[in-house]
């Protein structure tokens, strides 16, 4: 059977190398709760996950997914923008932050992430990451603002101080139709 190479699965491989039981993690774009669930399973009973989304439907979907897997108590699921994540976690305390830019699968495509708030949230998240912590970014393009957001985020990542952050950007090189771009930032 041929293995699927989804962007989120690729990112999860890196996340699993960086998250330990007892860690604090953030899912900056909770969506349907897939990344939140992965993070909750990795932090164990002694860790915690804070998941953000601006859509009530995403909050309910995430809570339901976590409850179905018996890990809801490990997460704080917050109806708020990821630009406010510093109000919920201390600087230099977070092991991993995940972002999936774009719109909620199955949701309103008009409610999508935007370049300005996404870049602001990335910088907020970098302050929260502890040394050795990582940020996973799944950058989708297309839609009304996707190309603008993709280009702005990639430009911003390129400008991060190389003495403080290692930025790895990959791409599905031979796939048509603007496939998503996985990126990782490790705080040095």
What are the language-model segments listed below?
Residues 148-188:
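Class I S-adenosyl-L-methionine
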Residues 29, 121, 128-139:
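Conserved beta-strand signature within the Rossmann-like core of class I S-adenosyl-L-methionine
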Residues 32-46:
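Conserved SAM-binding loop of SAM-dependent methyltransferases across substrates and taxa
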Residues 99-121:
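Mobile active-site "lid"/loop adjacent to the S-adenosyl-L-methionine
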Residues 20, 43-44, 129-131:
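Helix-to-beta-strand junctions that scaffold the AdoMet/dcAdoMet cofactor pocket
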Residues 48-53:
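Conserved SAM-binding motif I beta-strand of class I
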Residues 1-24, 37, 41, 59-92:
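S-adenosyl-L-methionine
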